[in-house]
Amino acid sequence: MKIAVVGAGRMGAIRAEDLLGDGAEVTIFNRRDLAAEELAKKLGCDSSEYSQIYSQTFDGYVVATATNAHVEILNSLVPLGKPILCEKPISLTVEETDEVIATADKYGTQIQVGFQRRFDPPISKAAKMVSNGDVGTLYTLHMYAHDHQPSTLEFLEGSGSIYRDLHVHDFDLIRWITQSEIAKVYATQAVREHQQYAKYDDADVSLISLTTTSGVQVAITGTRHDPVGHDVRLEIFGSKDSLAIGLNKKTPIHDIEGEINFAPVRYKGFIERFREAFAKESQAFHQLTKGEISNPCPPKSAREALRVAIACEESIKTGQPVNV
């Protein structure tokens, strides 16, 4: 299948590499044509001038640009009726997200949202165990979302907040694993170390307590700096079993008892932590373009996760729990 990758940055490179590895014909586009040319040369695929993207025929499109360009690009690609893989978020506002979804429905265009954690093998296995009843009645979920290095000012300008950028992944997983909506949230936050977050009314630490419509209680902790590495973990507790996901030799934490033989080098970033997940997600999109599978992560997923993030921000402002 012929797939156009729009964006020649870090995620564009990952998507192009994985799609090429899965047998797709990839053409890279970027608003800076030279960047597309350089990446294509590195990967051994085609590139083309950005202005030519609509004059060529493709079986699918990947939108891997900066967040603030997503809506404009999606609005121009959706009427073509071909499947689109868009990195999260579709937009930082519910209104724009709804407009994109409505247009996609009008043209029958499938938009797969880039929530790669769904494709992480241990997380996927845990979700299946929950679905199969192996964990029993769900009691609680404990989630950890800890970045290794704090964000740059350039990144912060367009990220939204720790809830819209980082925790949307957690909100999506909660909905996906529990198969229920998030009903109520209570969030607290602080700037403990990295003052650049205060400039944007953001935080470098966060703590969220939430409840799903099915009654599952969830606790989430987030940090923008973990000196040991990138730490994303999930613990699931139920009436039949308790599961730990993301706890392995490369988990960036020190075991005081010394029982776990940790590797000398831990996960240093989200790409390393979820590299296999990104590959499986790209492969799923390739299958979607072939009509072999249904959409594994439809745009409603992005919309609902965003709504929860906004509810967390409202909770911060009011100091009270907020119904989603």
Predicted regions and their residues:
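A short helix->loop->beta-strand "cap" motif at the edges of active sites that frequently abuts
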Residues: L80-K82, Y107-T109, V216
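NAD(P)-dinucleotide binding in Rossmann-like oxidoreductases
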Residues: A198-K199, T213-K280
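C-terminal helix-rich "cap/oligomerization" subdomain common to oxidoreductases
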Residues: L20, A24, G60-V63, D98, ...
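A contiguous active-site-proximal alpha/beta segment in oxidoreductase catalytic domains
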Residues: N68, L92-T152
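Hydrophobic residues in well-ordered beta-strands that form the structural core
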Residues: C86, I111-V113, I220, I245
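N-terminal Rossmann-like dinucleotide-binding module
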Residues: M1-L43
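Rossmann-like dinucleotide-binding domain that binds NAD(P)(H)
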Residues: L153-Q217, T223-V228, K300
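Beta-loop-alpha module in the N-terminal Rossmann-like domain of NAD(P)-dependent dehydrogenases
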Residues: L43-T103
